[in-house]
């Protein structure tokens, strides 16, 4: 029989150390074009989170190809992605320390092929007719904003990249046609983000390798075009949201034709480079992934019939779709399984798990599977979320007691809740804390209209949806309405602080590298996001009053609930001063506050020790504020101005009286 213990105090086999050190983080994925294709991918491994390059030939196990002192990662746009390119037997990667391109062989050490200090590279494509790379570059040598453009790099020459296209603020997805005569790419300008409005271009490649006869194919200030790819027979395909959802199109005879029209997104917001959702098995067959409110699905699309046929795979989170003539490889995850590198044989349906993000299984008896909910929110709208109820076969809560709720506001804010198994969520549900992962208005995966609910309303719509989601579950009787909490990172951290400053629903908050001062963020953040707030809040200086009204730093008087903050001191996306100003203001206002800062961490913690310490500090903070005693041995966290409520095991601090 299960023991009866208060929610939050259940003992769990899912420890903070397991969450921090038990999983690797897959990044880029590539597939060879042979009959039995080779797979290559990058993976960040604990404890340091350094990205290793892994190579897996057919009928062999994976082996590390690039390891320390290298770290396979690009910092273009700060978020990176597209640090790997496999072109036949050639493997190229970007090294984090110097941001230069290297080439590596099966039995040879990496060799640097660029000598361009102060420049970063990403999202390369191979021009086999000219034996060169065409790559997105970001030049940080001058004063002011870095300069983005497309460069050509000849691996055998080394040295200086040559600019072949420039003049726009941003570039992505250069792709050479199969016959080598044309180049396609995407560009956009301030103040747009690529999911707001972007343009797809093609140009002829002249004999000397320069670009001529540029032609705009699609895109506008109100149309987002992403992921250009050439079919084997030379037709340009892409994804556009011109009809309200990111759907597949092609460009034939100088006309744009829809390939699939449905209320589903065949792309995700391109925060990072080179995360494709489709590819070609042949000129007549596309393998793709798309998302609805029920999660991601894999499918086959006939380019002649324009018919979509679902492919049954046991995953609801699908990324990095890479296609060869008889195979598709992808990153797949579900609520029951952590992310894997999977390979599917298209003719037989044989599915092979090539690599796992974590070794060893979590006992399924301790896993909480999410329920998809749609709940009423402000202005007659509905919003979406994933509900995880407490699950632990060893315990149940006391009769009449309901569990506390942990509401999660995802980052971005133009992003979405993951459908893969997340030990960071199971850590809480296995201890008796319910979780609501909110896809608030502005999230991706529900079409352009849902994304644009946040236009001009960041700090309002997202907050209202988190508040109303929590209220919905409390009124339904699922959770304890007096123990509602909220957690968020980055943009989600801003949502946390706004929810605490402008509403009285949540008992406490957890803020990871969150935004507290919108004007400061607009002034200090990096180029890629430097005009993001124009759409989310309004243009400066015209809307300076709105920035002030929405910034939690100016509303400390309304924020009287305990908050714990976490910050990486090398964060260039949300600089540390955003957290430090808020912590200082709350301390002066005598609001209960705790703050943990981490040397060497950037935007999104990567080191296992950091992740473990932060998660344990959260649990300690929850116990002190909500009044339960965690079963874990926990290092104490200094909490300023928290009225004493006794101590619990592992707490070495002196409670305030």
Please give the residue ranges for each predicted region.
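Hydrophobic or amphipathic alpha-helical targeting/insertion segments
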Residues: 91-106, 110, 122-126, 130-133
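A flexible loop/linker signature enriched in serine peptidases of the S9 family
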Residues: 43-52, 72-78, 93-101, 115-121, ...
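Hydrophobic beta-strand positions that form the internal "hydrophobic ladder"
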Residues: 39, 91, 133, 183, ...
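Multi-bladed beta-propeller domains
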Residues: 1-25, 57-79, 104-120, 150-172, ...
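Non-catalytic accessory segments flanking enzyme active sites
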Residues: 27-30, 36, 43, 50-51, ...
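Residue-level detector of Asp-centered blade-edge/turn motifs that repeat once per structural unit
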Residues: 33-35, 86-88, 127-129, 178-179, ...
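Active-site-proximal cap/loop segments of hydrolase catalytic domains
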Residues: 440-657
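Cap/lid segment of the alpha/beta-hydrolase catalytic domain
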Residues: 141, 191, 357-482, 489, ...
